[in-house]
A protein has these predicted regions:
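Conserved donor-binding loop and adjoining core beta-sheet/short helix segment
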Residues: 24-99, 208-219, 227
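Conserved acetyl-CoA-binding loop-helix of GNAT-fold acetyltransferases
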Residues: 83-98, 223-228, 232-249, 267-272
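Conserved hydrophobic beta-strand within the GNAT/NAT acetyltransferase core sheet
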Residues: 108-110, 221, 255-259
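Helix-loop element at the rim of GNAT/NAT acetyltransferase active sites that forms part
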Residues: 19-34, 164-177
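Acyl-donor-binding surface of acyltransferase catalytic domains
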Residues: 69-148, 282-286
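Conserved active-site tyrosine of GNAT-family acetyltransferases
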Residues: 118-122, 270, 275
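A conserved beta-strand-loop-helix scaffold within acyl/acetyltransferase catalytic domains
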Residues: 67-70, 175-226
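A short beta-loop-alpha structural element at the N-terminal edge
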Residues: 1-21, 150-163
């Protein structure tokens, strides 16, 4: 049977999430996580469905993609299909041809597992490598230390506070209480937690959302941020440690995060919270002239 490119629709998102869960492995390269779809769900079910693409053969999903922002496709590929020549050729055709409905003409980026054959084909087509990102992972086999600050699990009643911390942590963020409820209504959030860290004065100083992919699989921190008025006091480390503890309670084998290598402060914060740096990864990109 031929390789099929699909748009799952709102009713098919659960199947895409299930595939992403199955493919998460501590021994494998970092790739799109169900938590990435969960975080995107803040825009609503319809918007998330419109941003997802799947590639399947003989009824089996082999790759899942998320159009995560203008001109960016983030991919996860089944472990036994990352060097599959037929899949790689079809992926390359679909991401390089605007008529296929994946990426528009012009500047574009593809984030794919580092060992995927797709990288070779895109390189042959003239796609270069972009700025490096640093993945970090913390093993959760052993109990996690106390974070040293008060941590609260945010539910519907704390959605306003969680949203306010998000906006105060990220310049340009428009995250609202409504976005939180939209995110929490998605299937991935059944295995997720939002945490809020509080300072000595009782102010909400940092926030993080953690996403489990199921017992024995790596969990994801996305996003983590510290209120701009409370930086430099160790709250980033504290809420990251709390995030690792929450994922361990959810049964995750490890806690994972990825940040631009140029963001040395974030890399240092995660390292201080017991996360180990992994080899840098790079997106493939096409500039506008090649579009």
């Amino acid at each position: 049977m031929a390789m099929m490119l699909g748009k799952p629709g709102a009713d098919g998102l659960d199947e895409a999430v299930a595939a992403l869960r199955e493919w998460q492995d501590d021994r494998a390269p970092v790739q799109l996580h169900p938590g990435d779809l969960g975080w995107y769900r803040r825009f609503g079910a319809a918007a998330t469905a419109a941003a997802v693409r799947t590639w399947s053969r003989d009824g089996r999903t082999l790759a899942v993609g998320l159009l995560d922002g203008p001109g960016l496709l983030r991919l996860a590929i089944a472990p036994d299909a990352r060097r599959d020549a037929e899949l790689a050729r079809r992926l390359a055709e679909d991401v390089t041809g605007p008529e296929h409905g994946v990426l528009s003409a012009g500047k574009a980026r593809v984030d794919a597992p580092a060992d995927a054959l797709l990288h070779d084909l895109l390189a042959e087509a003239g796609w270069d490598t972009d700025e490096p990102w640093t993945p970090l992972r913390r093993d959760l086999a052993q109990p996690v230390e106390d974070p040293g600050v008060r941590i609260e699990v945010a539910g519907p009643r704390q959605a306003t506070v969680r949203a306010a911390v998000q906006r105060a942590a990220f310049d340009g963020s428009t995250f609202t209480e409504g976005n939180w409820h939209a995110m929490a209504a998605g299937a991935p959030y059944a295995d997720a937690r939002c945490l809020i860290a509080y300072g000595d004065g009782g102010d909400a100083v940092a926030g993080v959302t953690v996403w489990s992919a199921g017992p024995g699989r790596p969990g994801l921190l996305e996003p983590m941020g510290v209120h701009r008025e409370h930086r430099g006091r160790g709250y980033g480390k504290a809420v990251t440690v709390a995030a690792a503890a929450a994922l361990r309670q959810l049964g995750s084998s490890s806690a994972m995060v990825c940040t631009p290598s140029s963001n040395t402060g974030a890399v240092a914060t995660y390292a201080s919270a017991g996360f180990r740096r992994l080899p840098e990864i790079r997106d493939r990109y096409r500039d506008e002239k090649r579009g």
